[in-house]
Amino acid sequence: MTIKSILAPLTNATAKGFPLDTALLVANALRAHAEVLFIKEEVRENTRMALIAAGRPEVQDALRQLAASTRQEQESGHRLARQKFDDLLARHRIDYRENSIPGDLPSAFWRVASGTAIDEIEQHGSAYDLIVVARPEENVASQPIVEAALFGTGCPVLVAPPKPPKVIGEHVMIGWNQGVPAAH
């Protein structure tokens, strides 16, 4: 199987790990196109909390402040992750473009989505040859992302190591459930 398209889903919680570094390293090594998908997870107000807050201005104010703080953290995390992406492109000399050009040099693109990481990965992940995710033991928040990639797409998944590798492919572990979706 030739790997020419790579998806690297990131959220605020997983951007501090190394899936971005690993995805761009793989793209560079395989002359592939990596799409980094930064998912701004929606701030959802808990219905039960909203009902409890009904008629209590102090609780409503606290919920509004929490939602505003979460949105601010999302924006800050997005800016930091995008800066890291731009720095890595320059360091690895990877072209920034929306689509790959067959047989060309490695390339990468940054896309932003709103929603949940699980939904985005399950909806779009199967369109890629490889999905690179953060290691769940290092980042508990990445566990649902790993599961969505593994079980929701049928695509090969590369779990990024806890530290960015200097080279890719020296140590490899393959897991396969012999299911039809995993056989492609």
What are these regions (language model features)?
Residues 16, 20-22, 110-112, 118-165:
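Gly/Ser-rich helix-loop-strand patches that form or flank binding pockets
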